[in-house]
């Protein structure tokens, strides 16, 4: 739980192997967090040495994004390990390839179920706990891919659009409870998950996303972009006529 001056002490990472998620956790540990729970399918073993080297107590629990009926139990297990959850980072998901999804509609539906449905069940489970505590922040990794969906990744982008809208609505539902939601909209981030994707303009590293999240938590922002230049860029992109939009590449 938070210490006497309100600093973050405990962090739960849903998607315990996510490179962006782990960068956020490491940043929070460097800033004083001391209890970390990494939630991933089959658990995370071994836990990242960088976190323990910084003095954090790191725990691992099983979490399957495709099994929404287990998500409340995962949150409860994390609470049993570290008590109140100061920050929960919602970082799980799958990217895949648009062409493969078009060839296999069932695979596309499974990906959408994880990238949207999994976040709905996990987000509601976390929100219930934060509301009960009366404090805490849920950090939701959305994407600029969901700001205006593009043809080259519309299965992934449409799920992110749904997630972004859900996170905003969840934030409004928590207003006045002491708990809050921070929506994070990164652009292209080179990670293992995106290794097959051609680089896009204005990339960000996992560390830069973590820095934006840290700043957003300190300022009690509701939304952060990484990098910040993407905010005005995508504000303008919303106005591009659809006849032109469909012809644009990355």
Features from the language model and the residues they span:
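Conserved glycine-rich cofactor-binding loop
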Residues: 17-18
